[in-house]
Amino acid sequence: MKLSTKVTELTNIIAPAVAACDVALWGIEFAPQGNRSLLRIYIEALPEEQAQNKQVTIENCAAVNHQVSGILEVHDPISGEFILEVSSPGFDRAFFSDEQMHAYVGQTVSLRLIQAIGEGDKKRRKATGTLNSIDATSLKLTATDGEQFEIALSNIDKANLIYEDA
């Protein structure tokens, strides 16, 4: 889950504006699309508010949109027109860093891998299962078919939480 140089640049510009709105930056997606790009910002309630079961509101999203729009006008890091979207990460949230997964040990995740794992006919580049543990270099996953994997974090292209209704 390596961030592009452009996403890193945008994160550095946007993070202070998001923090000024009393919410946490979960992640950024940037997709150049011809002459119009898409910038999607995911925000989350601050940890102390999450502990009180508070969540991101539409008002939070609107405030971040307003703040970030102003910052982007000044810094102008995106050439051409762009669409700005601000949202919560949702139940099936994408992980933008390895560190974000630590809070979800014991839950179901979906991984898209750079290189296939497994043996013979069971080789796969996608894996879904229970996240058993994660450390600085790898994670352990029990796939939905019961197979156990240790996967290098550097082999993960994309990771998402899979929401399961309790």
From Swiss-Prot:
It is found in: Cytoplasm. Keywords: Cytoplasm, Ribosome biogenesis. Pfam families: DUF150_C (PF17384), RimP_N (PF02576). One of its GO terms (cellular component) is cytosol. HAMAP family: RimP (MF_01077). Required for maturation of 30S ribosomal subunits. NCBIfam families: PRK14631.1. Belongs to the RimP family. This is Ribosome maturation factor RimP. The lineage of its organism: Bacteria, Pseudomonadati, Pseudomonadota, Gammaproteobacteria, Moraxellales. The gene is rimP.
